[in-house]
């Protein structure tokens, strides 16, 4: 199965690409949206700023949004999750808009959130085989889904409860970094690859 790892200047391409390959995916790193949408699945990496990443999206977001809404498997990680939403307080520019909602600054005493945190997961199959998830976070912003039923995982930081995961169709967003979250994180990536293979 061919997975497009989109390159908009995010900093974790190598580790994420390696984790995807270990899960059995053939990874193509690309900054061309036409090429990315021609693959079996799409991964939007994290570590970066919303403004430059949004600027790397096509001016017409509709083809990307429509491909994901039609069922193309996609995994957005950290910044990649934020790009799935409408827009962000961090910078001007529009996200893909697949998941209605906003991205806002964490109202915490210490920002960014850096380090390990408990994640309360639901029954979504992307968490299959993960009994108790402690994941690695590196974020200053949180995703606020307009429809709370899109949220599939939650975490708490400085008494702020935030969506740590969201899903629509075959698109998953994770605010934490599974590629940095030890064995449970690798299992989540393997689950995504398996789920994507089922529909590709």
Briefly describe each language-model feature range.
Residues 1-4:
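Extreme N-terminal starter segment of soluble prokaryotic enzymes
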Residues 26, 41, 73-75, 134:
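Structural signature of beta-strand start/N-cap positions in the alpha/beta core
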Residues 43-45, 173:
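Structural motif
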Residues 48-116:
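Cysteine-nucleophile active-site neighborhood
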Residues 143-200:
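C-terminal and late-domain segments of enzyme folds
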């Amino acid at each position: 199965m061919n997975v497009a790892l989109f390159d908009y200047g995010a900093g974790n391409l190598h580790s994420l690409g390696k984790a995807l390959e270990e899960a059995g995916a053939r990874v193509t790193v690309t900054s061309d949206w036409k090429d990315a949408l021609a693959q079996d699945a799409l991964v939007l990496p994290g570590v970066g700023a919303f403004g430059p990443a949004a600027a790397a999206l096509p001016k017409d977001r509709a083809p990307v949004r429509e491909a994901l809404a039609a069922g193309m498997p996609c995994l957005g990680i950290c910044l990649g999750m934020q790009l799935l939403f409408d827009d962000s307080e961090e910078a001007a520019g529009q996200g893909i808009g697949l998941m209605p909602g906003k991205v806002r600054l964490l109202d915490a005493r210490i920002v960014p959130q850096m380090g390990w945190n408990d994640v309360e997961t639901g029954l979504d199959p992307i968490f299959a085989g993960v009994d108790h998830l402690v994941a690695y976070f590196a974020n200053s912003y949180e995703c606020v889904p307009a429809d709370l039923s899109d949220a599939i995982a939650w975490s708490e930081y400085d008494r702020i409860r935030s969506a740590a995961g969201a899903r629509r169709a075959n698109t998953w967003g994770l605010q934490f970094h599974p590629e940095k979250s030890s064995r449970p994180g690798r299992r989540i990536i393997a689950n995504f690859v398996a789920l994507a293979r089922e529909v590709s």
